[in-house]
């Protein structure tokens, strides 16, 4: 195991429209002692790369102490997965960096402030997140932006990459919207925001070109490889490559087993030369769009 991600708790200062955490789960949380135990366990298994996530990890009063402890016991890379809102306070950002945070992974949910705030259901969140990203960059830390791909953002992925590259971001990933965890009625209401993979591909290509032109790294793990043209496969990777264990209160599982990353394979997948590097079709996606667009690559 090279990588561990610890979901510290599920409290958050956004109310994202696509995030459905059951009430009984929302109140679960690791204590500081629990977190240290899991950090120790991760190191005993050989992990040197750490993701700290949630929920929103920066809301925890012990977050700086947790980062410091992780560094002390030998984690070489500590990635804080945050919505970036509290990073708008430079003193807080610098405390995280001084404690040992080396990377900040920040999501962008819209192609403009209005779309981002609409998705977050947190007025002003884009503005504060943008300031937070700049503060993280000013601290000398790496910033990776996870771009949420929806029917709203799909056609402007390259614009998002160009803008954030202009302020210094050099790492991106494209995340296709997931409906996992939604009730049936909620999924029906929100399904119009989930684009078809085949519609995303050419817009993703433009984003890849924009990143290349900026000298930035970019990848996606959410577009099945049978849909990706051969010349775009260099931008594809699966979460399996991270050798990742995800740890949450009451749960522990491999990254490739996450319903956000894949799902059942089709009978025809057995004859696909890319099947070895594919995690299957997400069940929420198949319910909305079916599986007709997936053809085995010979």
Regions found by a protein language model. Give the residues of each.
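Radical SAM/AdoMet-radical enzyme domain recognition
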Residues: 32-52, 60-176
């Amino acid at each position: 195991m090279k990588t561990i991600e610890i979901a510290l708790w599920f409290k958050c200062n956004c109310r994202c429209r696509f995030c459905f955490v059951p009430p009984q789960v929302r109140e679960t949380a690791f204590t500081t002692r629990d977190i240290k135990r899991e950090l120790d366990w991760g190191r005993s298994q050989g992990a040197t790369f750490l993701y700290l996530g949630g929920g929103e990890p920066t809301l925890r009063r012990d977050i700086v102490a947790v980062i410091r402890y992780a560094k002390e016991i030998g984690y070489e890379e500590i990635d804080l997965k945050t919505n970036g809102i509290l990073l708008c306070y430079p003193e807080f950002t610098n405390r995280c960096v001084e404690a040992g945070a080396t990377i900040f992974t920040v999501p962008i949910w819209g192609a403009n402030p209005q779309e981002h705030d609409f998705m977050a259901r947190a007025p002003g969140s884009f503005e504060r997140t943008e300031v937070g990203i700049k503060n993280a960059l000013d601290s000398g830390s790496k910033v990776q932006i996870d771009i949420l791909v929806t029917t709203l953002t799909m056609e402007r992925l390259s614009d998002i990459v160009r803008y954030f590259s202009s302020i210094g971001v050099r790492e991106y990933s494209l995340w296709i919207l997931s409906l996992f965890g939604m009730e049936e009625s909620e999924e029906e209401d929100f399904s119009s925001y989930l684009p078809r993979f085949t519609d995303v591909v050419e817009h993703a290509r433009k984003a890849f070109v924009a990143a290349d032109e900026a000298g930035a790294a970019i990848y996606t793990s959410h577009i099945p490889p049978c849909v990706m043209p051969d010349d775009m496969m260099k931008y594809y990777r699966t979460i399996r490559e991270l050798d990742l264990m995800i740890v949450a209160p009451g749960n522990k599982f491999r990254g490739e087993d996450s319903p956000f990353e894949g799902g059942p394979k089709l009978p025809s997948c057995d004859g696909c030369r890319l099947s070895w590097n594919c995690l299957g079709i997400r069940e929420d996606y198949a319910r909305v769009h079916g599986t007709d667009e997936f053809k085995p690559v010979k």
